[in-house]
């Protein structure tokens, strides 16, 4: 590889902060101001090296052409019924945003109901959340611009898809819950703040409040229904009970799967909703999660992890709510995790479990909890479901590494509850029968068995010669289940690659126990698990260190950056997308304070001791051995990422280039690409997705000398 001339970047050696008696230098703290001329010049100088490097990758054009060709397949959501109509999302293939369609019946003609593509020239305005009124006659929907988490809520009359004048601003991380009379909707908003709020700012998000908006009135008249002046981090989302009588308020403080649960009986609000509601504090601690399923009168069914890390269903009678009186409806499974539950046809429950990172779907009886039926499913994930208490049918969508999607429909009024294939999608150009998926369990450093999926062409020789792409996340109780990815399958098909997904601790793959095994003082387990995944792939002959790429985004960006610092010898290439890199300061920006439940917070001496040991920004060092250099690294971020603000990646790349990049033995590139009019990832237009994956895989091909296989 060629050596790189990186930009000269100012280091402020006087920027020193004292953490519990430890002096920590932060020479690139000036990059924390996104609007300064200096930061803008830094971004421009970095993109000036990276963009040509990516464009000169011989494979980039071939990859982009193939991606554009193969990604051009129809993408459907499940149909869902609202009032008397059916709705579904559909993308013909390469549309920037999927379109919402309406039908009067399943056989009826489909009409466009809402097309976000006409709201911008470049597809950067995206639908972010929506809610229909109970009778299906009114529709509220959130729009976000350029990938920001900030949302503007608008309203439509469903009949004739007529736009209404109501507009709600300063909305973020919001519920959308209509009262059943259709007169208005609960939502969340933040107070006005100094400076801008367009997704390029870094100011912290505190004091979220719950409001009720009456349709046809101005936002300034909205009714404040809940606020927590003494608890600035609390966020309270509202939901209406199935019978419309109760408002349930779920209060969260961070990202842990725990919440308080307050409720208000709307029949007690004799004058309607006029101010702060009369909240009854059913659960007033953060010792478990309570997820509302349905209720029969005052008996409420919740999915909970209270004394059940794999989750169970309990009934709580609001007239006698003592914990000793709670009844177990469906007990916790000893191994499988209960992921979600829905009530349908008034007396059925649909339960979705995760069994060794593969979904299973079951039908239970609401009155007794008894198992009635197991729906047949291949090995893979349930990625879509629709069916509410008043519906008599369900739709669910299945996907896997090699199947783009099958939607099933089941009519629950029939004697034989047999689901039928409602819609199946195929991708022309990739023959699934040429490839295989295996799941293995490898030992981590402490002996814990970690699951990993491996996808590759059938019949390959395990001689260590193949490029491999290892993906991981490992945080926030999020399970990484099989999903269909054209971009990764192109790597397998045209770059002779092996795809691996490691289900490391910190995720929710085996419930709250698995999550807790990879957070706070145990965070190093995530990095050990991931490094052991790499070692397994190498030992078994799938790949070799110089042919191995690791990739992750957000918390997964933290993962791969930390692994590069800890084991630079183990990987050939690292692609870190929108990563959390400064573990001492992350809690100071936008919604970062919510992640202290997983990471801890440097304000605490004990937490500081954990964080300083692995924080990517603070652990960059030149490898001592002469024959070891850092892997090729590409950091990706964007100007409107207000979830993980870009300063994380900017400060990290400056540090890498200074400490490692100036060394004569460092021939592998250390680069960053900062996109514009893009954010953390949600709602990213197809055109940008194609550019991004073309950059990623072109970088891998160029750095690891991979040839294109026609």
UniProtKB/Swiss-Prot annotation:
Positions of post-translational N6-acetyllysine modification: 157
Catalytic machinery residues: 554 (charge relay system), 641 (charge relay system), 680 (charge relay system)
Keyword terms of this UniProt record: Acetylation, Cytoplasm, Hydrolase, Protease, Serine protease
PTM comment: The N-terminus is blocked.
InterPro entries, alphabetized: AB_hydrolase_fold, Pept_S9_AS, Pept_S9A_N, Peptidase_S9_cat, Peptidase_S9A, Prolyl_oligopep/macrocyclase
PANTHER family registered for this protein in UniProt: PROLYL ENDOPEPTIDASE
Function: Cleaves peptide bonds on the C-terminal side of prolyl residues within peptides that are up to approximately 30 amino acids long.
Protein name: Prolyl endopeptidase
Organism encoding this protein: Sus scrofa
Originating gene: PREP
